[in-house]
Swiss-Prot record:
Belongs to the GatB/GatE family. GatB subfamily. It comes from Synechococcus sp. (strain JA-3-3Ab). It is an enzyme of class 6 (ligase). Heterotrimer of A, B and C subunits. SUPFAM superfamilies: GatB/YqeY motif, Glutamine synthetase/guanido kinase. This is Aspartyl/glutamyl-tRNA(Asn/Gln) amidotransferase subunit B. Keywords: ATP-binding, Ligase, Nucleotide-binding, Protein biosynthesis. It catalyses: L-glutamyl-tRNA(Gln) + L-glutamine + ATP + H2O = L-glutaminyl-tRNA(Gln) + L-glutamate + ADP + phosphate + H(+); L-aspartyl-tRNA(Asn) + L-glutamine + ATP + H2O = L-asparaginyl-tRNA(Asn) + L-glutamate + ADP + phosphate + 2 H(+). SMART domains: GatB_Yqey (SM00845).
Length: 490
């Protein structure tokens, strides 16, 4: 009697993200201290953010504006009434021993973001809530990158009181790729709107991952584990992939999954246990008594909605539908607001959209990457790039000549046409000028000419090269090919 081996169970990840974004206000959420990154430790502090007795918080109006704009950009419902709460916990970088946040009545709820995946699929990720809170300070550990193993720790309170929004997703994410793309799309949207600079390395955008595993198709959630300390999009993806495999192995071995917070170690490419995961009851939330409720009017919403720019997802669709660009090109050009604005200015100046895209994604992108520059930093104006593209289309210069003069235009600016004329680079499109040069090329290469006429037609490229050399690259390629073909076959 034989018994069939049980089918191997397939598992899926259930992932939700909590993304903390520092708002790009010049002053803190409840006080007037500056928020600039990189200032000397404890030079951007005041009695309010230090929690000194007798101080009272006052909400920075810009924080409310930016939070509502973020909610609108993320397709959320804006609450007409919300409030602040105290989140109670003790940690050395939290001077008041509580954090002012929002608990049961956040500023925005029920939003969504659509992401594009590498296989061409799109997926909508739900947003549960978006709430406002203050950031904590920062611990600097001597001799280690975390508390464990350090000889002592210092506290920098510059970050305490910096305004944050926390964006909590629905558990709609299934893979590390989806998670990384979701965070990138959030970053694009917030940067476009001028609400957050999205710098993961500086901590202005931080992501915590909540992940559990379950058999594929099961409606039941597994035990959730939180992962922290990921400072790049790749790290988010790798941490999720590692943790998924770790949890699956534990489940298959019959080991329990502990609800805990784990730390992603970049050097060892693994997660390690950090602490037991707290529940919301551990924080003993209660309404903040020193701040009034927040009220957002329909007029405020309408005004802030009107001030939002066209967002990247809308640009991508428009570039494909109006300009006929590919999905890849549309995504590249809309990824950063500076890039998109430059591209649109080039097209507005009369350039063919596909030609403009090709130049920006190849030669100009290479120059920017090499010199670590962005479009506002270069001397090449959009109108000049459009002029350069026009010179190629008119047959005034070849693409080769355009590539040769591009670095000078990028560094010094000026008129493309004037530079071409000053350097004598105008394309030779007159057959009466090219014919004598072709005759010279053939006369100078009798051996190759004989081989060509005996059937070695691959030498045609050699003759094209010799003609281009003689004309210093100025011969009209199409005309040169036609004339050479006629002379060689004649």
């Amino acid at each position: 009697m034989t018994v069939a081996a049980p089918a191997k169970v397939e598992y899926e990840a259930v992932i939700g993200l909590e993304v903390h974004c520092q708002l790009s206000t010049r002053s803190k959420i409840f006080s007037s201290s500056a928020t600039a990154f990189g200032a000397p430790p404890n030079t951007q502090i005041d009695p309010v953010c230090m929690g000194l007795p007798g101080t009272l918080p006052v909400l920075n109006e810009k924080v409310l504006e930016y939070a509502v704009k973020a909610g609108l950009a993320l397709n959320c419902t804006i609450a007409p009434y919300s409030k602040f709460d105290r989140k109670q916990y003790f940690y050395p970088d939290l001077p008041k021993n509580y954090q002012i946040s929002q608990y049961d009545l956040p500023i925005a709820t029920h939003g969504w973001v659509e992401i594009q995946l590498s296989d061409g699929r799109s997926k909508r990720i739900g947003i549960t809530r978006l709430h406002i809170e203050e950031d904590a300070g920062k611990l600097v550990h001597a001799g280690s990158d975390r508390l464990s193993g350090s000889s002592y720790s210092l506290v920098d309170f510059n970050r305490a009181g910096v305004p944050l929004i926390e964006i909590v997703s629905e558990p709609d994410i299934r893979t590390g790729e989806e998670a990384a793309e979701y965070v990138q799309e959030l970053r694009r949207i917030l940067r476009y709107a001028g609400l957050c600079d999205g710098n993961l390395q500086e901590g202005s955008l931080r992501c915590d991952v909540n992940i559990s595993v379950r058999p594929l198709g099961s409606p039941t959630f597994g035990t959730k584990v939180e992962i922290k300390n990921m400072n790049s999009f790749n790290a988010i993806q790798r941490a999720i992939e590692y943790e998924f495999n770790r949890q699956v192995k534990a489940v298959e071995a019959g080991e329990p999954i502990v609800q805990e917070t784990r730390l992603w170690e970049e050097n060892s490419q693994r997660t390690i246990s950090m602490r037991k995961k707290e529940g919301s009851s551990d924080y003993r939330y209660f309404p903040e008594p020193d701040l009034p409720p927040i009220r957002v009017t329909e007029a405020q919403k309408a005004r802030w909605q009107a001030e939002l720019p066209e967002l990247p997802s809308v640009k991508r669709r428009r570039y494909q539908q109006v300009y006929g660009l590919s999905v890849y090109d549309s995504r590249y050009l809309s990824d950063e607001r500076n890039t998109a604005e430059y591209f649109e200015a080039v097209v507005a100046a009369g350039a063919d959209p596909k030609a403009a895209a090709n130049w920006m994604m190849s030669d100009i992108a290479s120059y920017l990457n090499t010199h670590k520059l962005d479009y506002p930093d270069i001397a090449l104006k959009p109108e000049t790039l459009a002029e350069l593209i026009g010179l190629i289309e008119q047959g005034t210069i070849s693409s080769k000549i355009a590539k040769e003069i591009l670095p000078e235009l990028l560094e010094k600016g000026g008129s493309a046409r004037a530079l071409v004329e000053a350097k004598g680079l105008t394309q030779i499109s007159d057959s009466s000028l090219l014919e004598p040069m072709i005759a010279e090329v053939l006369a100078e290469n009798p051996e190759q000419l004989q081989q060509y006429r005996e059937g070695k037609t691959k030498l045609f490229g050699y003759f094209v090269g010799q003609l281009m050399k003689k004309t210093q690259g100025r011969a009209d390629p199409k005309l040169a090919n036609e004339l050479l073909k006629r002379h060689l076959d004649g």
